[in-house]
């Protein structure tokens, strides 16, 4: 069999489960750290429940992803997860799911590993969304997850610091509501509603147009140059305001 025919025959199997995101759908990609509990608590021993060093590792990873060749207009990170919002005109790899997932998972794993000095991996999933409403709903959902996890984390580690075992702390918090958990923290002198915004709501990353003063040696004069730089927002809004905040990025030029 001629190689071209052989190649065509075998590629049918390789591409048999390929999926493409239709052009009328919005693309969001979520990446999650694999076995990060072990990495952050046992290997690197970051502070709990939050550590600015780990936060910065995650935001730097988002920045790397946003400069990896895709038309990503907004990035969000909380805990060990990342969500990326693509511009509607994104057509890299013809919007093939397999290529998007493998490329971004590889980029995230490489960037994070280089920065932390340890092998770390991420998985990736494409989330196709039908309209802007669901795009906003998606990011509100992840923000609510961040808020829930932050409250749980503060309570859990407060109990651990008091000498409770992991199983004891988990039992105390099992099936308990928000009021119980906030009251528990208040009794220990912690006002959960006053902890840093980024710990409760996560961080947003996006491009801003910055004006920089430069010098034109040919004309021997100062000039103002505009460039896009990535900005980390540690004070993102919450709830409906956050939904509106995210949707604005879909209107940005890329």
Where are these regions (language model features)?
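Regulatory and interdomain segments flanking nucleotide-handling catalytic cores
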Residues: 1-254
């Amino acid at each position: 069999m001629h190689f071209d025919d052989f190649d065509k025959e075998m590629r049918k199997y390789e591409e048999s489960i390929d999926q493409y995101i239709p052009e009328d759908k919005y693309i969001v990609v979520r990446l999650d750290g694999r076995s990060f509990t072990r990495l952050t608590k046992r290997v690197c021993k970051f502070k709990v429940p939050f550590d600015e060093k780990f936060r910065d590792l995650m935001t730097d990873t988002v920045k790397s992803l946003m400069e990896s060749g895709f038309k990503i207009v907004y990035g969000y990170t909380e805990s060990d997860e990342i969500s990326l919002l693509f511009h509607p005109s994104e057509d890299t790899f013809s919007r093939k799911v397999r290529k998007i997932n493998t490329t971004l998972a590889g980029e995230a794993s490489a960037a994070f590993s280089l920065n932390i000095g340890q092998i770390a991996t991420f998985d990736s999933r494409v989330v196709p969304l039908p309209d802007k409403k669901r795009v906003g709903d998606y990011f509100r959902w992840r923000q609510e997850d961040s808020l829930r996890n932050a409250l749980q984390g503060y309570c859990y580690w407060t109990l651990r610091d008091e000498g409770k075992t992991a199983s004891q702390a988990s039992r105390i918090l099992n099936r308990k509501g928000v009021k119980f958990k906030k009251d528990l923290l208040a009794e220990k002198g912690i006002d959960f509603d006053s902890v840093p915004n980024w710990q409760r709501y996560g961080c947003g990353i996006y491009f801003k147009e910055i004006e920089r003063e430069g010098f034109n040696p040919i004309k021997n004069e100062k000039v103002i140059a505009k460039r896009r730089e990535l900005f980390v927002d540690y004070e993102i809004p919450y709830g409906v305001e956050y939904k509106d905040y995210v949707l604005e990025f879909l209107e940005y030029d890329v």
